[in-house]
Structure formats: structure tokens, C-alpha cells
Amino acid sequence: MDQQPLAHPQQRPPPSLKNPRFTLELEFVSSLANPYYLSHLAVTYPNLLGISKSSDDSNTGTEGPDPEAQAFAAYLAYLYSYWKTPEYAQFLTHPGATLRALRLLQEETFRRDIIRPQVIEALAGTGLEDGQGGQNVEAGDIGHNEGDQGTQQDKENIASKT
């Protein structure tokens, strides 16, 4: 499989639907708006999200972080760094939900917690996909503010539903 998006992560692909790298990354980040896709990633590729296959009792601190998890976290940070700009966000079908998911995925604790069904259901219940789940979190904290201000509010909303 072509590893081009990881080969030069500092170079943004030109925002054109004719650019294969751009369309590949657009498809990937768009899929992150779906909490059930996040669940699929957590279950199928737990190592990429820093989820240990063994229980936390083996966490003695002697092992360093998984290099694959670090690379994937860096890739997510790279994606978030440019998809949040208006030049790229205009191509997103669900920009609020997509950018919210990318922002939450910047946090190690969130990447570990998304394997729990309660967290996924809470995300689905907040309207991550369509904004109909009660409080529309993404409208207030991503629509106009590209910072990380809404992260604590997102955590509290998710925690209150679990």
C-alpha cells in the first residue's frame, strides 16, 4: 500500500479533488466524523491508538511508547493542523464533527478511551455525526474557533453520558 501521506507529512497536498493524496486524506478525515468508525479503529488497530492489548497491570513503565502509536498521533496532528484552515475545511461534508474528532484525537487519554462502547455511544449522542443529539457541541467550539477551547467541554459532555 502507498505510504505517501506518511512519507512527507510536513507538505500539505494542494486542495484539489484531482490530487490523489488530497482525496485520500479527505476521505480519511471525513470518516473520523463517524464515532462508529473511531470504534472500528480502536478495536481493529488498538496499537495505533496507544491501547495496550494487555491490561493496565502490565504497565510498569519499563517499555517506551509504541513507535507506531507515536507516528499515528503525529499524523493526526499533521492532519488537524491543516484541515482546520478554511482553505481545506471547505471540502469537509461535516466540518464541525470532523474537526471535533480530529481535535479530540490529539489527546492520548481520548485515543485510549474510545475503545469503550460507552464513550462511542456518548459521542454519537452528542450529535457528532448530525448535530441532532441534544447539545450541538461542534457549532460553538469549532465553527468559529479553531483552538482547543472546547476540549474540556467535550470531555465533560462525554463523561456525563457514560
UniProtKB/Swiss-Prot annotation:
A Gene Ontology term for the protein's cellular component: mediator complex
A Gene Ontology molecular function term of the record: transcription coregulator activity
Compositionally biased residues, Basic and acidic residues: 141-162
InterPro entries to which the protein is assigned, alphabetical: Med31_sf (IPR038089), Mediator_Med31 (IPR008831)
Ranges where the record places region Disordered: 126-162
Keywords for this protein: Activator, Nucleus, Transcription, Transcription regulation
One Pfam short name: Med31
Biological process according to GO: regulation of DNA-templated transcription
UniProt subcellular location: Nucleus
Disulfides per UniProt: none
Predominant location: nucleus
Function: Component of the Mediator complex, a coactivator involved in the regulated transcription of nearly all RNA polymerase II-dependent genes. Mediator functions as a bridge to convey information from gene-specific regulatory proteins to the basal RNA polymerase II transcription machinery. Mediator is recruited to promoters by direct interactions with regulatory proteins and serves as a scaffold for the assembly of a functional preinitiation complex with RNA polymerase II and the general transcription factors.
Assembly mode: Component of the Mediator complex.
Family of the protein in this entry: Belongs to the Mediator complex subunit 31 family.
This protein's name: Mediator of RNA polymerase II transcription subunit 31
Taxonomic path: Eukaryota, Fungi, Dikarya, Ascomycota, Pezizomycotina
Gene name in the database record: soh1
